[in-house]
Amino acid sequence: MSPSNREYSQFLIIDDDPGIAKFLVTYLRQRGHTCHALTDGFQTASWLSEHDCEVAIVDLRMPKVDGISLISFMREMNPSLPIVVFTGVGYDEEQMHAALRAGANGYVSKNLPIEQLYCVLARVLATCQQRKRSVPSAQPVLAGAA
C-alpha cells in the first residue's frame, strides 16, 4: 500500500534533526510526493498559514517545542490535518497515548524500517479519504506497538 493519490501528495516534516528531515524528504520525493521540512516547531504556524499540506510528520522530542504541544497546536489550527508521529522515543505507551490524545492520527517509531512509516502514511491518508466521503473514521494507525 502506498500514499499514491496525487490529491494527498504534500507532506510537511517537522523534525529537529536535519539528517532525518532530509532523509524523509528524499525518501518521499523518490516516491513522487512533494515535501517541505522544518527543523523548528516554532516555524510551523507561519508555514501552515501560508502553505497547504495534506499530512504532517512530527517528531516528539525537539528542543524548542515538544511534539505533544506542537500536535495540540496544529490540531487547533487545522482540525482536519492528518498528523503522524515519527519518533525516536520508540514504543513508549505513555508517549503514544499522549500523542494520540493531543490529536495525532498515527504513531511510528524511528527504529522501525522506513517502510513502516510509509504504510502508516498510506493508512492515515486512506482514512482521511473515507472521512471526506463521510464514511466513519478508523482507529489511529500505530506501528511498533506491541
For each predicted feature, which ranges?
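The feature encodes the CheY-like receiver
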Residues: 21, 63
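Acidic, metal-coordinating helix/loop segments flanking the phosphotransfer/catalytic sites
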Residues: 37-55
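Acidic catalytic/metal-coordinating carboxylates
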Residues: 39-40, 66-69
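Short amphipathic alpha-helix used as the core "switch/output" element in two-component signaling
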Residues: 46, 68-80
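Active-site residues of response regulator receiver
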Residues: 59
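Alpha4 helix (beta4-alpha4-beta5 surface) of REC/receiver domains from two-component response regulators
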Residues: 69, 90-106
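Hydrophobic/aromatic residues positioned on beta-strands within the core alpha/beta folds
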Residues: 86-87
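C-terminal output helix
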Residues: 94-95, 112-122
